[in-house]
Amino acid sequence: MERAMEQLNRLTRSLRRARTVELPDDNETAVYTLMPMVMADQHRSVSELLSNSKFDVNYAFGRVKRSLLHIAANCGSVECLVLLLKKGANPNYQDISGCTPLHLAARNGQKKCMSKLLEYSADVNICNNEGLTAIHWLAVNGRTELLHDLVQHVSNVDVEDAMGQTALHVACQNGHKTTVQCLLDSGADINRPNVSGATPLYFACSHGQRDTAQILLMRGAKYLPDKNGITPLDLCVQGGYGETCEVLIQYHPRLFQTIIQMTQNEDLRENMLRQVLEHLSQQSESQYLKILTSLAEVATTNGHKLLSLSSNYEAQMKSLLRIVRIFCHVFRIGPSSPSNGNDMGYNGNKTPRSQVFKVRKVYDVVRKIDVKEMNFTKHAFINQTSHEQEPLELLWHSLDEWLVLIATELMKNKRDSANITSILLKQKGPDHQDATPTPSFAAAGTESRKELSTDTGDSKTYEVAGKQEAYADCQDVISMTANRLSAVIQAFYMCCSCQMPQGMTSPRFIEFVCKHDDVLKCFVNRNPKIIFDHFHFLLECPELMSRFMHIIKAQPFKDRCEWFYEHLHSGQPDSDMVHRPVNENDILLVHRDSIFRSSCEVVSKANCAKLKQGIAVRFHGEEGMGQGVVREWFDILSSEIVNPDYALFTQSADGTTFQPNSNSSVNPDHLNYFRFAGQILGLALNHRQLVNIYFTRSFYKHILGIPVNYQDVASIDPEYAKNLQWILDNDISDLGLELTFSVETDVFGAMEEVPLKPGGASILVTQENKAEYVQLVTELRMTRAIQPQINAFLQGFHMFIPPSLIQLFDEYELELLLSGMPEIDVNDWLKNTEYTSGYERGDQVIQWFWDVVEELTQEERVLLLQFVTGSSRVPHGGFAHIMGGSGLQNFTIAAVPYTANLLPTSSTCINMLKLPEYPSKEILKDRLLVALHCGSYGYTMA
């Protein structure tokens, strides 16, 4: 009966308290009953359960083997913690990681729990398995108030963890100012190194903790490297921590020059150096000028080393350009930058920055250059005793002297080569003059010198030998100096450009290029890759482009494509992320049933800069995303742009290309749509997406800014083009045509007379002015009639593709960039080819020709097709459907008598290749490739 009553009472208490009132007998089960109560600090319930139980309060459970005292300390359950301590819980019991309850209380900032644990003799010096004590945990988390209480019980405030780090190390690394001050006040060793030799200052700088670094330096911390020689400044620069660098320089001024010298270290990231110097330059005008002056001096030193032929070209070139890039960056962000309207000329003196580079020194430099027994020596005297000289001006002066010297030698040897030729011809005698080619002095070498020097003893022979040797030496010097000088020229261009507002070219640099035009062209002709390595200004400056465009366009198409995309993306925030995924808010959401209009609307509202970096499209109601969807979007828009319903483009006479519609104004939104069409093609080119659309040659010329000519008229009116050709080919003086400089044009059914020039209706076309008439009427048909459409298209296109970059290509190459390389079926080509003027299918030359075509690359086959037909495409249906000037016209090969060095030519209006009767397959292939790559339309000799 008594037992039953006791069970009933336990049941009643349990139901009232909604918990058990008696712990299980085994510790494992009991501890999981108590743990949630301890976590909630339900000390009365815990006390009641423990009072009638044999539970071991030090029982360790779980994966990390912690006791309930660990749980209470970790959660801040101070009442339960005290209860457990009174019940005999061990305050120094360590879990599997070596942590005591005091460690956990310190880590989580449980102040009351820490106090009670200390009352019950918790050992503050116990380390966990990683060597961390309670004060380490307080320092990591910046719990200064608790640290004040704890350090009174600590015997060694510099106790180290497994890596030799003290509490001061970790407090400095995490930027806890008051904690650092507390530890220092408590006697922490301010210069104590860890196992790798890193001091607290080193730790502060490693994470850019400016304030803790300043406290340490104020308290006398030493500037010490670690065991690997890495200094606190190294860490600051590596992380781009400008503010911390500023503090280091404040206490150690010598470090300023160390930072400047770091600009030569290619192992340091350039953008981090820029960040540091940018911050330092913003502190004061004097600091800004000091940085620029120092950078200019280092750049000058590196530039002169680069001009020294004994230095390592690759290393010195990279160092110079790196320093100059950093210099220009700092220069631009100054308080009186060009964008703010201030004159930044090197030679000016209106702004403080005109004094940036000036240093008061007396220079007396004598430079002597003697290369491979050269017959000339350069003495450059720079005497400055009465005025200040800008450091960089010394480098530019040396550059100028080098270029003048080379120009002089080139001119001298050019005269000598003419004299040598004359002497050689006289020695050979009149019977040999016709058979003796002019010597190629670019290839003059040792053998030619030996031949000349071992002649009969004629004094003229030795004269020739000496001059040839001098010429060869000059060529050696150019070979050794061209790249070095080109790198310095690039540096000069960068410095000139940083003084100018965006988009403007420095007049000083233009003058420099004009002055040294011959030498620069010599460099480019000898090594065309210089254009892409150092002579970027040729493409970035419209004023200079025309002078070198023929050289630029002579470079391989592949090289120009690589340069194009490299510079197209170079101005973006992160050129490595051009094709990165875009933000959800930047996705172009379009409707399939109105894809043209909806795409036009969303693209016009989108951020152009973001579209350049990445593009994503989603069709309304569909989940698909990714490059496949983008590809489909461009494909569909390619067809929609030339959809007759929009009246934007009309099909040309060849049936495969399109031309802007001069009557597109029937669509009220036609100019908006033309701008959108330009945006789509610009976007496609930017992201290397091909479009399935082809335009007339004249339209590609409009995109490139190339003037059209009368031959372009054939794409829209072949018969009229033939008439223009006839006028040019024949004397019209006595024909009585009575043409004037005006034409009649059908404007929506009404005939209007349009003057080709002011007063054109009263100016007769004559034999003398007929060429002008043909050009003006061509411009009317091909340009003036569609000028608004062209302008709108280019406005959209240039949002994504700068005009200066696209001019790298001709109209044929632009088509390849936009629409890709067409596939050419050689068998179909052969089957639909005709032969004339003496050739037949079985002739040896014809067999060689087709063997060569089989050996050509796909790109070269396209060039051949363009060369003969004027088009890179095969029409739908194959070669049987190729159009000529008067309709269908098969590819035709005509025989031409062979003479030495004769190139193939073509007549594109009748798709005819005029192929000389070459004596061998090798000569045929060589001459054909020369013609294709040199574009010998109308040429007859190599």
Swiss-Prot record:
Catalytic activity: S-ubiquitinyl-[E2 ubiquitin-conjugating enzyme]-L-cysteine + [acceptor protein]-L-lysine = [E2 ubiquitin-conjugating enzyme]-L-cysteine + N(6)-ubiquitinyl-[acceptor protein]-L-lysine
Single GO BP term: Golgi organization
GO cellular component, one term: endoplasmic reticulum
KW Membrane (keyword) present: yes
Keywords: ANK repeat, Cell cycle, Cytoplasm, Endoplasmic reticulum, Golgi apparatus, Membrane, Repeat, Transferase, Ubl conjugation pathway
Domain of life: Eukaryota
Start-end of each ANK repeat: 23-55, 64-93, 97-126, 130-159, 163-192, 196-226, 228-253
Domain spans labelled HECT: 607-942
Task performed by this protein: E3 ubiquitin-protein ligase involved in Golgi membrane fusion and regulation of small GTPases. Acts as a regulator of Golgi membrane dynamics during the cell cycle: recruited to Golgi membrane by Rab proteins and regulates postmitotic Golgi membrane fusion. Acts by mediating ubiquitination during mitotic Golgi disassembly, ubiquitination serving as a signal for Golgi reassembly later, after cell division.
Name used for this protein in its record: E3 ubiquitin-protein ligase HACE1
Lineage per the UniProt record: Eukaryota, Metazoa, Chordata, Craniata, Vertebrata
Gene name of this polypeptide: HACE1
